[in-house]
Amino acid sequence: MVNFRRLTLAAVTAIFLIYGGLLASLFYYFDGAQFLATLVSERTLFSVGLSMAAATLATLAALLLAIPAAYALSRYTFPGRHLVDTLLELPLIVSPAALGAMLLIFFTNPLGAWVQEHALQFVFATAGVVLAQFVTIVGVAARFVKAAFDEVSPRYETAARTLGATPSGAFFSVSLPLARNGILAASALTWAKAMGEFGATITLAGTMAMRTETLPIAIFMRLSTADIEGTVGLVLLLVGLGLGALFAARLLTRRRYNG
């Protein structure tokens, strides 16, 4: 009879070997001097700076919507609640390229054209990078934050209300502090997802060097010119930034459960 524990551990090992093997294969083409040259190049510094700035702005904007929306979905019953809750999964079931195409099509209609002409230029512009990232992460951010609020018992808010707190007062003084670590972890994960966003960004903002060239787009452009060593350097940089964000999220989640 197959040992169940060994079977499950074998599955864990298989997953580790898949991703670990992919990461290890990068070092076949790794060159230290080329890696350093890639890191300090003007285009790399620009793409890293743009990626981090855009991801930060997109994450902050997403959280401004996600936190109140997630709280409403976690606490209230209202018409269309299940529909909205389902739509949060849209970025997970629709490819980023499709989301980017939706945005591009929107800006070709009269309303979108008016926004482009009188408000802000998004198509093939830096603002389009932020918008593309925002659209791909806001639903995911709301899902993560809702999970944090779901773990906070409504009884704490009820107790605060009986002591005279208003609904908003109970939210800011009780629910938000108790969900803080979960929200911070959600922020880190959302930021990491924004950093790695490619499909929607390239569809809406294009691949203009030193203008809309985020780190994932820089990887694509290096690979398209058969610059394998440069591609490896940028991939390792993106992986390092992403793993750093994931480590922060994991640490915050652990603190959340350990009190």
Where would I find each of the regions flagged by the language model?
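Short glycine/proline-centered loop/turn elements that form peptide/ligand docking sites
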Residues: 152-156
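Short coil/turn motifs that cap or connect alpha-helices
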Residues: 79, 165-167
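Membrane-water interface segments at the C-terminal ends of transmembrane alpha-helices
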Residues: 1-31, 42-150, 174, 178-199, ...
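Glycine/proline-centered hinge or cleavage motifs at structural transition points of membrane proteins
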Residues: 163-164, 177
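Helix-terminus/linker motif at the lipid-water interface of multi-pass membrane proteins
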Residues: 29-38, 201-206
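The alpha-helix within a helix-turn-helix
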Residues: 160
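Glycine-rich helix-loop "coupling/hinge" segments at transmembrane-helix boundaries
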Residues: 200-227
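Core catalytic ATP-binding domain of two-component histidine kinases
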Residues: 169-171
